[in-house]
Amino acid sequence: MRWLPQISFSSPSSSPSSSLKPVASYSESPDPDRNQDRDRFHRRLFRFNRGRLTRQRKLRHLTDDDVLLGERRASTSSSTFDSGLTRSPSAFTAVPRSPSAVPLPLPLPLPEVAGIRNAANARGLDDRDRDPERLISDRTSSGPPLTSVNGGFARDSRKATENSSYQDFSPRNRNGYWVNIPTMSAPTSPYMSPVPSPQRKSTGHDLPFFYLPPKSNQAWSAPDMPLDTSGLPPPAFYDITAFSTDNSPIHSPQPRSPRKQIRSPQPSRPSSPLHSVDSSAPPRDSVSSPLHPRLSTDVTNGRRDCCNVHPLPLPPGATCSSSSAASVPSPQAPLKLDSFPMNSQWKKGKLIGRGTFGSVYVASNSETGALCAMKEVELFPDDPKSAECIKQLEQEIKLLSNLQHPNIVQYFGSETVEDRFFIYLEYVHPGSINKYIRDHCGTMTESVVRNFTRHILSGLAYLHNKKTVHRDIKGANLLVDASGVVKLADFGMAKHLTGQRADLSLKGSPYWMAPELMQAVMQKDSNPDLAFAVDIWSLGCTIIEMFTGKPPWSEFEGAAAMFKVMRDSPPIPESMSPEGKDFLRLCFQRNPAERPTASMLLEHRFLKNSLQPTSPSNSDVSQLFNGMNITEPSSRREKPNFKLDQVPRARNMTSSESESGQQQQQQQYRSPDLTGTVNRLSPRSTLEAIPSPCPSQRPKPSSSDRRRTGVTSDHL
């Protein structure tokens, strides 16, 4: 085309023939036909090249000025070719050779060329399903741009197909490298997935797996990579939202795994779990991409809006959903169930007492709501005291499992959980006799002491008949229920006598201990029946504790109290009845052989007085203890005993007024029940009114009784 300036600046008198003559004179061969064939061959061989040799020969006949002007234009055109500019929008279609003599200006490079190329790389099904001519045109246009001046695009599709097998791998054309692959459902990713994509047999696409090389201008935003949670396996699939672009037009559900999820810059966008990060690639924490994240995000958003395809099948290992994962129980859950005692039947409640070797709690049954006393003891295998404690607990369990009596606490069971030992016993409320004394002004009436003593002896008689000695009878080990029934508890010091000798060691509490235990006489005695006498001595000390509120010799310390027990007998309270004093003298016999047994003491008049027909029965005592109304309204004969003085004594009344007033009082006031009488007579105990005879056999009140009730002799 360098002969175009010569046409523009030639004189009008010159002709085409004269202008072409220098070409023949400067040719290498004198044959014009041969030169034309050679030129035709060069044009055909260097169609896509510049053809400098031929064009330079045609410019040899020009003047110096024309040659300089043509060389400037040639240098400008050559620099344009070597700059490696990307294609213009007009390069998508072939432009025919223009016959015009006026050269067209070259297009300028566009700023959004990189974004358009990324859009082409990020396309899914649209780029895969394009026609071959469009694909070849795009691939060819990624090289040096061809303008309409030099031509080269006016060729048929057959020649273009032949040339398409040759690829230019130079650094200038590496960005335009394309791979024609079959349609697959996996997204384009800059990383190779070690897990192959599952093939969909339902659509009939039985296609091989593929690998896409990374693009040199691929842009993504590197997010925070997750850290493995301790105790959980590493995930099989990473969340593809780790890259800010989702190049797959087909979106699968996000995988769920019991670990920390990957934080993505685009959390609201769906992801595909088919591609995972290469295991050899080290994880990156909080690495920001040097490229702007909006570069590929905007293209992807516009690309995904127009897709309507079938969803991908879930990959292996990612089929569990969040609901199913949440419903799977933790492997540590069954271990927690085994930590509850008695197969999760009893739940520990509040603390109700502490002993020498453990604590006692209130436990409730989770199925029935029943209550029991749970004794808890910590186990220390290397501690000698703990070994002794375990020995006593085993002895207590062995004894209680063979005892069944209304005046002995019932044994439910026992077990060992980890380093703790549990014993489940009958729960007796409100508690021990010691607690009962503190809650009732520190003392008891003799009638209450008599009733409690009878219950204690009943349990001791049964226990001694089983050849078992308790050895720790005191107020703290005697429990009282709401009905006033006393039960023996705490058999840690108990011993079952099997041999012919009563070999008892020094065990028990000093204030309630028998003197023979301190003198070690029982170890030399051959009569085992004398061993039961230690419980009778302890019973006498407990009676004093109930009557006075403290055990004998309580003013002394432990060692001094032991010396007092060895030398003297406990003092008997002076306020007790003669029957009560005689009962205590029998219990405090220094010689154990002279002490009566529990069965013999049950026949003592101190206890028989409460069993006579003139006194309420045992059931009546228990009902009075509960504050129940147990009597019927009294007869007319006994009403004056319970009348209140409503008329002044010094008031002078006629006989008619007195009779009318007496009738009015009889109609207005009824005899109150025993509960009201008991509450008025004794604020300390509800059993203080028991010694009086029953209403049917009650004698006529004396003058002193009439004064106490406020009834005058005139009213009678």
Swiss-Prot record:
Gene Ontology CC: cytosol; plasma membrane
UniProt keyword annotation of Kinase present: yes
UniProt: ATP binding residues: I352, G353, R354, G355, T356, F357, G358, S359, V360, K375
Region Disordered: start-end pairs: 1-42, 74-98, 119-180, 238-302, 610-716
UniProt GO molecular function: ATP binding; MAP kinase kinase kinase activity; protein serine kinase activity; protein serine/threonine kinase activity
Major enzyme class: transferase
Induction, per UniProt: Induced by chitin. Levels are regulated in a proteasome-dependent manner (at proteome level).
Sites of Phosphoserine modification: S617, S622, S658, S660, S685
One Pfam match: Pkinase
Reaction equation(s) it catalyzes: L-seryl-[protein] + ATP = O-phospho-L-seryl-[protein] + ADP + H(+); L-threonyl-[protein] + ATP = O-phospho-L-threonyl-[protein] + ADP + H(+)
Phenotype of gene-disrupted mutants: Normal morphology in standard conditions. Impaired chitin-induced MAPK activation (e.g. MPK3, MPK4, and MPK6) and altered subsequent disease resistance to A.brassicicola associated with reduced levels of chitin-induced callose deposition.
Post-translational events: Phosphorylated by PBL27 during chitin-mediated signaling in a CERK1-dependent manner.
Family: Belongs to the protein kinase superfamily. STE Ser/Thr protein kinase family. MAP kinase kinase kinase subfamily.
UniProt name for this protein: Mitogen-activated protein kinase kinase kinase 5
